[in-house]
Design a protein with these regions (language model features):
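A conserved hydrophobic secondary-structure block that centers on an alpha-helix together
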Residues: 37-76, 151-156
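ATP-dependent phospho-/nucleotidyl transfer catalytic cores
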Residues: 88-179, 255
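Conserved protein kinase catalytic/activation segment
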Residues: 189-204
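Second-shell loop/turn segments in exported
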Residues: 36-42, 128-133, 160-161, 234-235
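Middle-to-C-terminal accessory/interaction subdomains
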Residues: 150-154, 159-168, 178-180, 200-205, ...
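Gly/Thr-rich phosphate-binding loop signature of adenosyl cofactor/nucleotide-binding cores
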Residues: 83
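Conserved NTP-binding catalytic cores of kinases and kinase-like/nucleotidyltransferase enzymes
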Residues: 1-50, 56
Length: 336
């Protein structure tokens, strides 16, 4: 006797909408919104789940996930990853009071003045964002912030960023995106909210299927694909200031010492894979990636080792003599 509840269902996803196995957004009568992702391009099916777990561990509030088996009109549709939506309920459950919420829906959400495709000035500096919640001035405030990033200089720029950006959260989020290799996550696929008390912007992860050594189509990619600074106009302006470069470098090192290690990730990834292994074998839509599934834990751990070595080498090259991080850290940790 399962529970029966009314719900509204719609397709979700970008290129995956064309796949035979669809992904869905579920809105229950209670107001709970869930995403059921087919994860068709990820042979492990755990990259989103592992990324959100990792982000949570390093201090970035992230969606909760769980695997589910879906049947449609009595017909088995296979295994899905259920992902909590980033919405009012998400913030309420975490005690975060917020003023507005936007989704970075495409790569125009890059904190730049020009459109990434046409290279012409954007019609609105808020292009690329999907308005979710807020007031009539939400997009105006965002446009003013982005405009200030490119108009202000030196101490005035630094003051404006400090006033409007939660730098601690930003550095954690940036480090997480960089270490997991989420190439698409710097200019889109994130949630941007304004904290109600401070008025500062916070940034949260949204879609991390392309990570841990594979791109968003599931193809292997090099561990040095994503540079340690990430990619967007906000980060570029933040890193004009040496003290903020140092803070970010120290955050990267802290995470590589504590959370981004084979010893920490291995048991989590292994547990996730073991939990879904029997269901993956029963899902006909996953037949093409079944062979790869068995090697995904080793693949992910190999990526972590390579990524750690690359990031540490790049930190030395990027910072030079500007900062003096501990010699042991810059030389590489024991798990490398």
């Amino acid at each position: 006797g399962g529970r029966i509840s009314g719900a509204r269902i719609r397709y979700r996803g970008g290129h995956t909408r064309e796949y035979a196995k669809k992904s869905y957004e579920i809105q229950l009568e209670s107001g709970l919104v869930l995403h059921w992702n087919a994860e068709s391009d990820d042979p492990s099916m755990i990259r989103n789940a592992l990324s959100f777990h990792f982000m949570e561990q390093i201090g970035v509030p992230s969606p909760r996930t769980r695997p589910v088996w879906l049947s449609v009109s009595g017909r088995p549709d296979g295994i899905y990853l259920e992902i909590e939506a980033v919405n009012s309920r998400f913030f309420s459950m975490r005690g975060i009071r917020y003023r507005s919420l936007l989704y970075a829906a495409n790569d125009s959400a890059n904190f730049e003045l020009k459109d990434p495709e046409s290279r012409r000035r954007k019609r609105s500096l808020a292009d690329g964002y999907e308005f979710i919640e807020g007031d009539g001035d939400t997009l105006v405030r965002l446009s003013d912030f982005i405009g200030g990033l490119h108009r202000l200089k030196d101490s005035r720029l630094q003051e404006a960023i400090e006033e409007r950006l939660d730098l601690d959260l930003y550095f954690k989020w940036l480090a997480g995106a960089v270490l997991t290799g989420n190439y698409d996550g710097f200019e889109q696929n994130y949630a941007l909210y304004e904290d109600d008390a401070s008025g500062r912007y916070g940034i949260l992860p949204w879609d991390y299927e392309g990570s841990w050594g594979r791109n968003c189509f599931g193809k292997p990619c090099s561990a040095d694909l994503v540079r340690i600074q990430g990619y967007n106009g906000l980060t570029r302006r933040v890193f004009q200031f040496p003290e903020w470069r140092r803070r970010y470098a120290e955050e990267l090192e802290r995470i590589m010492e504590t959370e981004f290690t084979e010893e920490r990730i291995g048991p989590v990834a292994g547990g996730m894979l073991e939990r879904i292994a029997s269901a993956v074998k029963l899902d006909p839509a996953r037949a093409a990636t079944l062979k790869a599934f068995g090697g995904e834990k080793a693949f992910i751990l190999a990526y972590i080792g390579k990524r750690r070595r690359f990031v540490r080498a790049e930190l030395k090259r990027w910072l030079g003599n500007e900062v003096s991080l501990p010699r042991r850290q810059l030389a590489g940790g024991s798990s490398d």
